[in-house]
C-alpha cells in the first residue's frame, strides 16, 4: 500500500507551494514529473493502466516536463516497441487530462496540502533555530543539517550504519 492519489497530489502541491518563493529573476523552477519505477505492477495489462492513470494524475501538477517511465520497466528494460507503446498511452492520458476538472481544488487535497505546508514550516523554523547565528543559510549548512538528523528532526535511516551520519 502506498499514498492515495489525492494525498500524493496534496504532497506535491505542498512542495510546489514551499519552493515557489525561490522563483525570481535569477532562479527558475521547472517541474518534471515521472512515475516511480517501484510503483509499476509487474502484470503487463495492469502496468499499462497504471501508466495511463498516473500520467493523468501528474497533469494536475502542470509539469513543464513529463518523463515517461515505460510500463514494462518493472519487468525488463524497455525495447523500442515498448517505448512507442508507452508514448502512445501517455499521449492519450495527457490529452484526456487537458481541460479536465481541476483535481487540485478538491477539498481533501487542499486541506492536506495546507497541513503539510504548516508542518513543513514548523520543521524549517526548527532547523533554522539550530544554526549558529553566523550561518547565513541553515538549510544548506552541513553541520546544522547533521544536527537536525541527530536530534531526530529529520529522518535519515540510510545513514544508520554510516560513520558520517552520526
Residue ranges and their predicted role:
Residues 1-91, 95:
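Helix-rich catalytic cores of soluble enzyme domains
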